[in-house]
């Protein structure tokens, strides 16, 4: 049996949606203000972390490089901090506002999804609600996992590749502030959304736009695409490619299991 909220007139649905949107925007504004009041922590310790030689990922892979008999100067190690420059009068202020705004969205994303779920939940049947239990926790977990993967794995690889790639020994690589911050924020947000792939598969299977046999049949093709994607976003050696590829393959395989579970319950 569906909730009587389904019988609400159209404009009452719009009013209900407006309420959830206001709550989401308020949460995002609060998160943005919190980030703005912690500028030093956000920029010096978090966003500029991958630009420093002592970043945890570089230290970890430097040690792994020694274990696997690489040279003393590990492929994942910088000899000095990266040079980042700002060339616009209001560049730092614009970056400050834009970064805190995007960061506010990332920080409040679980709550925003919660508000979205509260809006659509009354339209679900009791059986659909039963199989959707824990969806908020799962979305939050996968999104945070993707954000961490983007920050600690993807960002260092991309930055290292951009810093070490040379067309000639003549030009120096000095990063532009806006390009650097955009790379960090884009990597974090895109990986957070990418890790929600199993959730998308769940709903696509529920509405029968995709099926378990289809995902299983084209698994090898999907893995090949993931391999190409991982190779494109990593420096080029096999080890870094595998590090990025494995989580993507696990996500796809997990999505197959989810599709099978949903299909079986129908």
Curated annotation (Swiss-Prot):
Gene (UniProt): tatC
Molecular functions (GO terms): proton motive force dependent protein transmembrane transporter activity
Homology family: Belongs to the TatC family.
Keywords: Cell inner membrane, Cell membrane, Membrane, Protein transport, Translocation, Transmembrane, Transmembrane helix, Transport
GO terms under cellular component: TAT protein transport complex
TM spans (from-to): 28-48, 93-113, 134-154, 183-203, 221-241, 242-262
Bilayer topology: Multi-pass membrane protein
Function: Part of the twin-arginine translocation (Tat) system that transports large folded proteins containing a characteristic twin-arginine motif in their signal peptide across membranes.
Primary location class: membrane
Protein name according to UniProt: Sec-independent protein translocase protein TatC
Source superkingdom: Bacteria
Quaternary assembly: Forms a complex with TatA.
Localization per Swiss-Prot or TrEMBL: Cell inner membrane
Pfam families linked to this entry: TatC
HAMAP family reported in the protein's UniProt record: TatC (MF_00902)
A biological-process GO annotation: intracellular protein transmembrane transport
Lineage: Bacteria, Pseudomonadati, Bacteroidota, Flavobacteriia, Flavobacteriales
């Amino acid at each position: 049996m569906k909730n009587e909220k389904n019988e609400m007139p159209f404009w009452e649905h719009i009013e209900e949606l407006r309420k959830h949107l206001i709550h989401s925007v308020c949460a995002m504004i609060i998160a943005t203000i919190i980030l703005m009041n912690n500028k030093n922590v956000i920029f010096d310790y978090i966003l500029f972390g991958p630009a420093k030689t002592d970043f945890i990922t570089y230290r970890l892979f430097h040690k792994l490089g020694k274990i696997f008999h690489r040279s003393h100067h590990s492929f994942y190690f910088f000899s000095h901090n990266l040079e980042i420059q700002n060339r616009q009068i209001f560049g730092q202020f614009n970056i400050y506002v834009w970064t805190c705004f995007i960061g506010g969205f990332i920080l409040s994303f679980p709550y925003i999804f919660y508000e979205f779920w509260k809006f659509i939940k009354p339209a679900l049947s009791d059986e659909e609600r039963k199989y959707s239990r824990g969806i908020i926790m799962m979305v939050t977990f996968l999104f945070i996992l993707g954000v961490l993967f983007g920050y600690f794995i993807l960002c260092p690889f991309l930055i290292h590749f951009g810093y070490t790639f040379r067309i000639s020994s003549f030009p120096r690589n000095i990063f532009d502030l806006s390009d650097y911050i955009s790379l960090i924020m884009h990597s974090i947000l895109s990986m957070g959304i990418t890790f929600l792939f199993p959730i998308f598969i769940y709903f696509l299977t529920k509405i029968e736009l995709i099926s378990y046999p289809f995902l299983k049949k084209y698994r090898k093709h999907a893995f090949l695409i993931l391999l190409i994607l991982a190779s494109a976003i990593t420096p080029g050696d096999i080890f870094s490619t595998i590090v990025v590829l494995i989580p993507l393959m696990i996500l796809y395989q997990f999505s197959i299991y989810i599709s099978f579970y949903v299909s079986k319950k129908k």
